[in-house]
Amino acid sequence: MDRVRIGVLSHAHGHASTYCQAMRDFPDVKLVASWDDDQTRGRQAAQAYGLEFRPDADAVIKDPRIDALIIASETNHHADLIERAAGAGKHILCQKPMATTLEDCDRIIAAVRRAGVKFSMAFQMRQDPVNRKMKQLLD
């Protein structure tokens, strides 16, 4: 079975830990490496989830063993990290919100389209049964 090899860019958002916890049990996923601009937080998370810690984001972004990246940094860093990740041909799951400005959203969209990589925002609550029912009632 082929495994999707995952890298994590920052553990600033708590959901990064949730993703890593869940993915450790997926037979078709391998957690490979992570980076965090807070090296203490990054090293602790890497150790907890069996990731290699890298003190440089580009070392994770350019790692040929990594297929996709989870970006869970502070929102003001999303556009820069996504441009670099997409440019390296990595598929991306980005923690919400996408960006702090419309200009950065446009940069992200352009980078992903230019690179032809898969991109998803982590808006998982759209599929929550209660939210779907509320939407149905409003429609």
Question: What positions do the PLM features span?
Answer:
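Alpha-helical elements of Rossmann-like donor-binding domains used by nucleotide-donor carbohydrate transfer enzymes
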Residues: 18, 22, 44, 59, ...
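Short, Asp-centered acidic motifs that coordinate Mg2+ and/or phosphate
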Residues: 33, 68, 118
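General small-molecule cofactor/ligand-binding pocket signal
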Residues: 32, 54, 120
